[in-house]
Amino acid sequence: MLLDTIAAISTPRGEGGISIVRMSGQDSLNILEKIFKPKNKKVSELKNYSINYGHIIDNEHIVDEVLVSIMKAPNTYTREDIIEINCHGGYLVTEKVLEVVLKNGARIAEIGEFTKRAFLNGRIDLTQAEAVIDVIHGKTEKSLSLSLNQLRGDLRDKIATIKKSILDLAAHINVVLDYPEEGIDDPVPENLVENLKKASAEIKDLVSSYDKGKIIKDGIKTAIIGKPNVGKSSILNSLLREDRAIVTHIPGTTRDIIEEVININGIPLLLVDTAGIRNTDDIVENIGVEKSKELINSADLILYVIDTSREIDEEDFRIYDIINTDKVIGILNKIDIKKEINLSKFPKIEKWIEISALSKLGIDNLENEIYKYIMNENIEDSSQKLVITNVRHKSALEKTNEALLNIIETIDMGLPMDLMAVDIKDALDSLSEVTGEISSEDLLDHIFSNFCVGK
């Protein structure tokens, strides 16, 4: 247990029904006794896991009418004594309650320190700590489900199973090398080899799940591009089901990048409506055009829009020539008044979708095509199986598997057992990096810096 007691506001700042001021640490109950006056009881008489009505007091003056939750160690979020003060949700009154708590012995918590204490005190491992922030930031049902699986400890348990296979091998080797008089045969037992091969296959599956998992968690950046007034903003509004971007018949209305997130079948899609790309003397519009060109190179998917009510011209081809990826879907907009267009002039685009953004005709087909394009493999059940979404986990697991394959090769070649020692250590260390059993202070600081102060 860490020695000092920390406190912070755990709810968003601003006005609301309630705010929560949270304390964690060995002095939490002592501090509460100084500042809380429960109705008809003493603080020392309050039961564990109870909610208690009363007032926060500062120098005999009432600060606020509150409900106080008491949770005593070790069965708490941090494995320390935790007090949560539910006060009125005004900005000033919440600050006053926190001020009283700090004045009586607590210190302000660092970013993510409550969850960091849960990790340091052994209640959760590092994968579960990372899952906490993923749950908070979850954008869709699928991403939330993956995060909850990890928070539950699914990845931790899988790592433990893989680690046991390696430790069983290490134990066998130690007996053979340290006690030759026992007469144990040198060859590694077949069941240990099979367990190693199974562990390697499981790691390979986890690593290969990363690309899909990252899409489910973070979504993909999708740029809507085309010349001015082809209907890019109307397409954005149609996909959003609301009027987010200004739509006029005047070319150049969208002068800056507009970003919005939509949910397509459980996949978050960061839609970016770009400024129409054209030659212009307008300084502000020109900045937007340059941003659009940069975005084309960084986008995961491009929606290239053509206005079918007009003839194709040099501007259409100039924008098409900027596209340097095959990750593109062509959109033929305004099909209700379309002209005949020779699509063979756009060989980089294999798939075209006909729509009318104004009347919403074809928008459902566009959404389905975007989803099919992203999910070119069936991952409908990804939320029901173990999927990794963190590049740190992927990198460490790749190192683990490299060491495992070296071990298996050493066994298959019949080489001396002591040659496996380095690879066994590397495999175990890499797995421990995933769970946080081996971690640097810089890594922990980086991970917990993504949290809010009260978490």
Curated annotation (Swiss-Prot):
**Record-listed E.C. numbers:** 3.6.-.-
Q: Where does GTP bind?
A: 229-234, 248-254, 273-276
> Where in the cell?
Cytoplasm
The note on cofactor binding and number reads: Binds 1 potassium ion per subunit.
SUPFAM superfamilies under this entry? Answer: P-loop containing nucleoside triphosphate hydrolases (SSF52540), TrmE connector domain (SSF116878)
* Sorted UniProt keywords: Cytoplasm, GTP-binding, Hydrolase, Magnesium, Metal-binding, Nucleotide-binding, Potassium, tRNA processing
A Pfam family of this chain? TrmE_N
The positions annotated for binding (6S)-5-formyl-5,6,7,8-tetrahydrofolate are 22, 84, 123, 455
Enzyme class, UniProt record, top EC level: hydrolase
The answer to whether the entry has keyword Protease is no
The residues that the entry says bind Mg(2+) are: 233, 254
- Kindly list the positions annotated as binding K(+): 229, 248, 250, 253
Could you name the domain of life of the organism this protein comes from? Bacteria
Q: Which cofactor does it need?
A: K(+)
GO molecular function: any one?
metal ion binding
Q: Which residue range or ranges hold the TrmE-type G domain?
A: 219-375
Question: Could you tell me the Gene Ontology terms of the biological process aspect for this record?
Answer: tRNA methylation; tRNA wobble uridine modification
The text of the family note is:
Belongs to the TRAFAC class TrmE-Era-EngA-EngB-Septin-like GTPase superfamily. TrmE GTPase family.
Function description: Exhibits a very high intrinsic GTPase hydrolysis rate. Involved in the addition of a carboxymethylaminomethyl (cmnm) group at the wobble position (U34) of certain tRNAs, forming tRNA-cmnm(5)s(2)U34.
Q: Which HAMAP family match?
A: GTPase_MnmE
Subunit and partners: Homodimer. Heterotetramer of two MnmE and two MnmG subunits.
- Protein name listed in UniProt: tRNA modification GTPase MnmE
Q: Which organism's genome codes for this protein?
A: Fusobacterium nucleatum subsp. nucleatum (strain ATCC 25586 / DSM 15643 / BCRC 10681 / CIP 101130 / JCM 8532 / KCTC 2640 / LMG 13131 / VPI 4355)
Gene designation: mnmE
